[in-house]
């Protein structure tokens, strides 16, 4: 713990693009502009990249307790999914077809992606949106950031800005599937013109759409610090606790027709009936951040900070008909039912800094990051039928250390107010050591070191004040995750890091009423890691490098704002009475050559490796990469304070694997959501009250947004002593999303 506290003194990003970093409030207090904390990991207006900014106002519009991915669903090239089917619990987001392991996520510039799995588990930070000030989505490699390379995109989340005045806020929402959410927050404003203290807490419960997919989630957010005209110092402590009944196995294809909410979790694939009641995932995560932003002389700005992220938890599962000797080698072999817990304990700590110079058309940043992850993986058997077991014994035990270091330099140079030159160079080192035994008692000892050079360059031309064109090139490198490394080790293979060349070119029309953007991208992968159907000796899936694959497409997004002329009815009818927001992506996502492995099993379900079938596929589609993603939002404001929005989403078919097999796919789907919000002033009783209702999937379309597939062949003796084969047989599993459902709530600000 001493080491953790020692490292709680250094972490964030670079500063504003001008010398103005503070604003005066109505009370004449001066408060530092909080957005400078995230600028080093964000694209600026002159950056030659594709990005989208989502304000706190936009985030709050639909915030009734669903996870953050669902509040970003209408942004360009984004597809979301929910294991429980209703947006609460385990949720996921894909950008340009890339899942969360390939999307870099930062909170105030601090990496959120798990250092080993590289995934992002939004369930660990429930109701994060209530504490968010803004989010920027960059698509493609984007600018240099902290943590793993962005292969699909990056999400930069800024937590809430300190308020200069005291405030209080409370919200409650309820909805389908016994969903309930309560949130309360309060702040002191600036005390003695400089000091502040703010806090909030949330509680969310839901039964979920899928059977037993219940969630019980808690979160909190506290920040305190000092703000002046040239300095901001903040200490943040936030985190969450989650207990969710497992729903990550999906629903078998045949069950979709008769019982689309069937959940196999807790039944051990049908061997346990009734289902085990505590087949749950239990995890807690705590974030500590100490952030400093300081305006220096000579047009310099400094950001620095320290962080520690602590995680601890397990998932519990029932296993039927299991040999107890596999867990306790001192016991005689016997088949019994048991309950086991698979544990993870970890800490991730370190710091980052950025020094920014902005003057006379030059905007330059020099920064760096260091983080060390320490993790423990172990398992326990807490109960076995008719067998006395040692509940504290670890039947497997492993430990990991991962060091992540980067240093970068970035410069934007604006020449003659017309041309903006962009150069960004990053060096990143990753060292990973892991050893012990895994869940199948396999022994491992792996040491890996990777060195990555990630250059980026681009050009933005301002044809005039409204018309901008740009082009850029970026190189990204990404290390394999823990599963990739271990499965390669167990199968005596070499797993290579992935590399991607990202070329982007676009046009921006900066009109206040009709903004528009068009972006072309070509993402060329070398050694992309993909699932092949191949398994280790104990049945774990193996990802392998495919030499050549690519994604290319065009993204369109924009808005139309129709304003009422004149101000005769200003107190009754808002000026901006109707808006249309849209995005459209059309893409090709291809693997040039892909080898699929289909295994054969005998009558005892033992694998017969000599009968493995290998099929080579050419020019196939990359899994989970729809060629069309489109969204359309219509927003009407008929009277002041009232907003009515109709959000429409359409996604074309996606394949569950990389074979382009029409029998292994997600069908095209679309849905429409209707949200209504009405805000009224409270006058002497408070600031305002907002009533909100969100109707999801109003046309009750039944669809699936995620899934997985595997194929097997079966061998049998036909009596001649020769094994005959039957198959292959394909098994598809899907994650069904809820039909029509609703959430409604009230928010009061004091």
Annotate each predicted stretch with a short phrase.
Residues 69-111, 133:
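Extracytoplasmic beta-strand/coil segments of soluble accessory domains associated
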Residues 111-139, 158, 255:
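Short acidic/polar hinge/loop motifs at secondary-structure boundaries
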Residues 4, 573, 650-655, 678-750:
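C-terminal beta-signal and adjacent terminal beta-strands/loops
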Residues 18-61, 100, 515, 519:
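Short, acidic, small-residue-rich periplasmic hinge/interaction motif at the N-terminus
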Residues 174-205, 210-247, 283, 288-299, ...:
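Transmembrane beta-barrel wall of Gram-negative outer-membrane proteins
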Residues 282-439, 460-464, 472, 514-520, ...:
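Face-selective signature of the C-terminal outer-membrane beta-barrel domain
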Residues 520-524, 542-658, 747:
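Gram-negative outer-membrane beta-barrel transporters
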Residues 295, 301-307, 462, 468-474, ...:
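Membrane-embedded beta-barrel scaffold of Gram-negative outer-membrane proteins
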């Amino acid at each position: 713990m001493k080491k953790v506290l020692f490292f709680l003194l250094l972490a964030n990003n670079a500063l504003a693009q001008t010398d103005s970093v503070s604003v005066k409030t109505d009370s004449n207090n001066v408060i530092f502009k909080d957005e400078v904390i995230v600028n080093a990991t964000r694209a600026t207006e002159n950056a030659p990249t594709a990005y989208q900014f989502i304000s706190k106002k936009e985030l709050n519009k639909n915030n009734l307790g669903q996870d953050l991915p669902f509040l970003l669903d209408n942004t360009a090239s984004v597809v979301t999914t929910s294991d429980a089917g209703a947006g609460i619990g385990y949720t996921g987001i894909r950008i340009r077809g890339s899942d969360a392991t390939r999307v870099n996520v930062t909170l105030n510039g601090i990496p959120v992606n798990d250092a080993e799995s590289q995934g992002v588990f939004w369930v660990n930070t429930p109701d994060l949106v209530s504490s968010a000030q803004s989010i920027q989505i960059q698509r493609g490699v984007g600018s240099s950031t902290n943590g793993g390379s962005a292969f699909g995109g990056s999400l930069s989340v800024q937590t809430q800005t300190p308020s200069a005045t005291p405030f209080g806020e409370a919200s409650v929402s309820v909805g389908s599937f016994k969903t309930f959410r309560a949130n309360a927050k309060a702040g002191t404003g600036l005390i003695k013109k400089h000091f502040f203290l703010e806090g909030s807490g949330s509680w969310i419960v839901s039964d979920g759409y899928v059977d037993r997919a219940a969630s019980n989630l808690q979160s909190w957010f506290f920040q305190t610090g000092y703000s002046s005209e040239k300095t901001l110092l903040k200490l943040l402590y936030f985190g969450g606790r989650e207990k969710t009944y497992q729903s990550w196995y999906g629903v078998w294809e045949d069950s979709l027709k008769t019982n689309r909410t069937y959940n196999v979790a807790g039944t051990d694939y049908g061997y346990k009936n009734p289902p085990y009641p505590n087949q749950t995932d239990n995890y807690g995560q705590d974030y500590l951040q100490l952030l400093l932003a300081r305006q220096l002389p000579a047009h310099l700005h400094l950001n620095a900070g320290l962080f520690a992220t602590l995680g601890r938890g397990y998932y519990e599962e029932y296993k039927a008909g299991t040999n107890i000797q596999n867990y306790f080698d001192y016991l005689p072999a016997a088949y019994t039912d048991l309950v086991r817990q698979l544990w993870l304990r970890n800490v991730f700590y370190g710091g980052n800094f950025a020094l920014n110079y902005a003057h006379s058309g030059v905007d330059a940043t020099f920064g760096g990051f260091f983080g060390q992850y320490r993790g423990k993986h172990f398992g326990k058997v807490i109960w076995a039928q008719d067998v006395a077991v040692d509940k504290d014994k670890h039947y497997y035990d492993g430990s990991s250390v991962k060091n992540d270091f980067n240093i970068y330099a970035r410069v934007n140079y604006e020449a003659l107010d017309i041309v903006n030159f962009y150069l960004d160079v990053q060096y990143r080192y990753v060292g990973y050591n892991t050893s012990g035994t895994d869940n199948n008692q396999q022994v491992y000892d792996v040491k890996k070191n990777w060195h990555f050079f990630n250059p980026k360059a681009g050009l933005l031309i301002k044809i005039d004040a409204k018309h901008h064109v740009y082009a850029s090139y970026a190189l990204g490198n990404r290390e394999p995750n823990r599963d990739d490394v271990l499965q390669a080790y167990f199968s005596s293979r070499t797993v290579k890091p992935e590399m991607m060349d990202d070329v982007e070119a676009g046009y921006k029309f900066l009109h206040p009423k009709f903004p528009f953007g068009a972006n072309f991208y070509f993402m060329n992968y070398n050694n992309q890691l993909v699932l092949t159907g191949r398994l280790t000796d104990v049945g774990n899936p193996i990802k392998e490098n495919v030499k050549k694959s690519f994604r290319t497409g065009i993204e369109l997004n924009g808005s139309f704002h129709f304003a009422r002329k004149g101000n005769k009815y200003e107190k009754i009818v808002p000026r901006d009475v109707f808006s249309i927001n849209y995005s459209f992506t059309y893409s090709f996502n291809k693997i040039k050559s892909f080898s699929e492995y289909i295994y054969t099993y005998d009558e005892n379900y033992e694998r017969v490796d000599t009968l493995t079938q290998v099929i080579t596929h050419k020019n196939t589609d990359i899994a989970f990469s729809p060629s069309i993603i489109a969204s359309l939002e219509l927003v009407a404001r008929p009277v002041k304070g009232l907003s009515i929005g109709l959000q429409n989403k359409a996604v074309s078919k996606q394949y569950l694997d990389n074979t382009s097999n029409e029998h292994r796919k997600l069908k095209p789907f679309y849905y429409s959501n209707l949200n209504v919000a009405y805000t009224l002033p409270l006058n002497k009783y408070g600031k305002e009250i907002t009533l909100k209702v969100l109707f999801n999937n109003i046309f009750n379309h039944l669809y699936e947004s995620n899934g997985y597939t595997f194929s097997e062949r079966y061998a049998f003796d036909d009596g001649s002593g020769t094994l005959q084969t039957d198959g292959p047989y394909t098994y598809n599993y899907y994650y069904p999303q809820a039909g029509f459902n609703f959430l409604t709530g009230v928010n009061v600000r004091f």
